[in-house]
Structures are given as C-alpha cells and as structure tokens.
Amino acid sequence: SLSELGINIPANKRKVGFLFQNYALWPNMTVYQNISFGLSNIKEPMAKIDFETKNAARLAEILKAPAEVVSVLDECRDKDGKLEEKKAILKLIDAFTLSQYTAKKLYDYHLESGKDGRNEAAALLAKVDTGRKSAADAGYTLDEEYRFCRDGEVVMQTRKLTKEEIDLTVRRVSRIVKIGMFMDRYPAELSGGQQQRVAIARTLAPEPTVLFMDEPLSNLDAKLRLEMRYELQRLHVETGSTFVYVTHDQ
C-alpha cells in the first residue's frame, strides 16, 4: 500500500524532525517537559515489556557490585561531606544508564552507609523469578530484553510510551548534548547555546527517520559546534536516518 511505502502517511504518524536556527522552545515548560512533550503523544505498535521485572533485574545486577555505586555517590558530597541527593541521582542516571525512577530506588538503598547490597540483590532476583513465572502462567515467555514473547515472536501492542521509556529517552538525548543538569530550568534561564542544545535534544528524542536541519549549530561555541557535528554524524550512521543539512559555512 502507499502508506507502507511512506507516501500518504498522516502528519502525526510521520517520523520527521525539523531543527532550525530559530528554535522555538515552549517558554512555560521546563527543559525536561520540552523534550518529553512530543514523546508523550506517540502511540504506535510497540513490544509489550515487563518493566517491573526488567528494572528489578537491572538493580540486582548493580547491587552485586556496591563499591561502584559508592564511588559514584562519593563524588556527590558537598564540602562538609554531606551527600547531595539531587546531584547523586543525576550521577547514578548517567553512570548506570537508568531512568530517574530507577536511580531514585538505587539511591534509597543508601549503599554509602556501608550496606552490603547482596541481600537486596537476592530479594530483587526473587522478584525477577516471580515476574517470569507469572508471564509463563499467562502463556508468555520473557526474552533477555524482558519483552513478552509467544511462540518465539515478540508480542506487539499499540500503546503509548511508559514514564520509564520517556525518561530513558530524555536522559539519552540529554547526554548527547550535555544538558542533564538543566532539566528543571525554563528556557529563559538558559543561554542561546544551551537553548539550541535543548532544541537538538527535543528533535532527536522521537528518533525521526528523516531530519531536516537548517544551521542547527550556529549558536554554539566553536568547541561545542565541532562536538555536536561529530555527534550528528555518529547519529546519522547509528540510526540510519536521512539527514538534510543546510549550512552557510564556507
């Protein structure tokens, strides 16, 4: 059919991103809301995933090596040696590629107080077994990504992205453009270059298959412009998307 060929696709289903020199961020939304807004409107066939079991397995894996967590947390102490929770959660998000929700759970184990973590890991692994068992009782298996499978096929369902998936995507694109620390700020509180980086992150978040860019790096300083150009080239190769890039640089 024409729509399978990519012709006649309704506007809200087109995976197209636009990035201009004048990026229009929503002034009444935080950086986080600006990036996540488009993601919360996506509704399409996706794999059905058992996130609770997946996150329990991930946390169990991390808790088995508590020293790594403690060394990340130790970097987040103020001059009086007190742990700064907000900074610690941001660090855990990036160090272990977690969502803010899972990072908060990890933080709440308070491994910095010398706890071993192995008992908690065992409890989480029991939870993983329960998750696999209840999937089996319902006639499914869980694959290594914790997707529900039946007869070896991944089960698809038309659904919206979960809070967890949205958060992981926001964190992933904010790592690319280095804006993780600005999540709670409003556009007016950012410099032109920072706003430009938010606009880039917002455009990349839904993983467009075609990306139109007109001077997207013009407001960045020379070092960041080079980094972002390299990053866009890498994304181009990694995602296999089509990039149309307009520049007036000689």
Give, region by region, the residue ranges found by the protein language model.
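ABC ATPase NBD coupling module
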Residues: 2-17, 41, 46-48, 60, ...
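Histidine-centered active-site/metal-ligand motif
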Residues: 27-28, 96, 110, 236, ...
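ABC ATPase nucleotide-binding domains
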Residues: 33-37, 41, 46, 156, ...
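Post-kinase regulatory C-tail/linker adjacent to protein kinase catalytic domains
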Residues: 52-61
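Catalytic "switch" loops of ABC-type ATPases
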Residues: 16, 20-28, 249
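Nucleotide phosphate-binding site architecture
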Residues: 2-3, 26, 180, 218
